[in-house]
Amino acid sequence: MSDIETVSSFVEGAPPGELADVIADIKSLTLETNPDIVNSLTPAFEKYNEEQFVTVKLPGSSQPVIISSYNSLGDGRYFDVESSSSFTFDHTTQKASAVQSHVLEGAQADLVKSTLKSIGPYVDEHFANAAHGVYPIESDSKIAIVIVGNKYSPNNFWNGRWRSLYILDPSSGALEGSLKVDVHYYEDGNVRLLTNKPVSSTISSANGAGIVREISAMEKRYQEELNKGFVSLSEGAFKGLRRQLPVTRQKIEWDRVTSYRLGQDIGNGGSRR
């Protein structure tokens, strides 16, 4: 594996909200051997930004829009249906520029707009720091529905991201997708949760309200599965990692701690060797 491939894998595997830290580490590690290596990582940045559904605010707007392969126009330009605009996105700096008008037309335009109208309130209610997008794909034969929610808490040593992707075939009502959770906790350790849940369903009424209703039901079930999994881990595998201590259910009287056997062992540790 070449140096570029190795460093690219670091970029593509960066935890949520920590890409800048990864880049800083790469620069530090390659300062003497290859100080310009970051300039060669544009393909890795593009892959990361599109796969992670990175969000950006367009100039003059406070509303975040999603970067993904589903709303790519090629040559670094992307479009946003809700704002009827297209823009250039710099994958290295994660900045948007050159905003232009982009009016959605085509066979799925009405379905895309009705789905956008229905999914907005759902996302606002259930996700923090979230963005969503609905796009026509595959020669206007299907639509892609994308949701991303980010929660960054570096002061508490953790960051997290939820990603939902759904592909709807209006002709059959088939809805297929994946739900992904990525959480990184790094206080006095390094723990990362990565999940990928494939989902599928059939929409009897292919309209915005029906689509969002089914999405809500699938995501609720998955959230319940995750909660059960956390309880199982806490009571099972994680509990087994902890050193077992006897439970006396008695408060320690700290002013008398030396009278306890543990205190005696500590106090006389030197003479007992």
UniProtKB/Swiss-Prot annotation:
<dbReference type="GO" id="GO:0008290">
    <property type="term" value="C:F-actin capping protein complex"/>
</dbReference>
<keyword id="KW-0206">Cytoskeleton</keyword>
<dbReference type="GO" id="GO:0030036">
    <property type="term" value="P:actin cytoskeleton organization"/>
</dbReference>
<comment type="subunit">
    <text>Heterodimer of an alpha and a beta subunit.</text>
</comment>
<dbReference type="GO" id="GO:0051015">
    <property type="term" value="F:actin filament binding"/>
</dbReference>
<dbReference type="InterPro" id="IPR002189">
    <property type="entry name" value="CapZ_alpha"/>
</dbReference>
<keyword id="KW-0963">Cytoplasm</keyword>
<dbReference type="InterPro" id="IPR037282">
    <property type="entry name" value="CapZ_alpha/beta"/>
</dbReference>
<comment type="function">
    <text>F-actin-capping proteins bind in a Ca(2+)-independent manner to the fast growing ends of actin filaments (barbed end) thereby blocking the exchange of subunits at these ends. Unlike other capping proteins (such as gelsolin and severin), these proteins do not sever actin filaments.</text>
</comment>
<protein>
    <recommendedName>
        <fullName>F-actin-capping protein subunit alpha</fullName>
    </recommendedName>
</protein>
<dbReference type="GO" id="GO:0051016">
    <property type="term" value="P:barbed-end actin filament capping"/>
</dbReference>
<dbReference type="Pfam" id="PF01267">
    <property type="entry name" value="F-actin_cap_A"/>
</dbReference>
<dbReference type="InterPro" id="IPR042489">
    <property type="entry name" value="CapZ_alpha_1"/>
</dbReference>
<dbReference type="GO" id="GO:0030479">
    <property type="term" value="C:actin cortical patch"/>
</dbReference>
<keyword id="KW-0009">Actin-binding</keyword>
<keyword id="KW-0117">Actin capping</keyword>
<dbReference type="InterPro" id="IPR042276">
    <property type="entry name" value="CapZ_alpha/beta_2"/>
</dbReference>
<dbReference type="InterPro" id="IPR017865">
    <property type="entry name" value="F-actin_cap_asu_CS"/>
</dbReference>
<comment type="similarity">
    <text>Belongs to the F-actin-capping protein alpha subunit family.</text>
</comment>
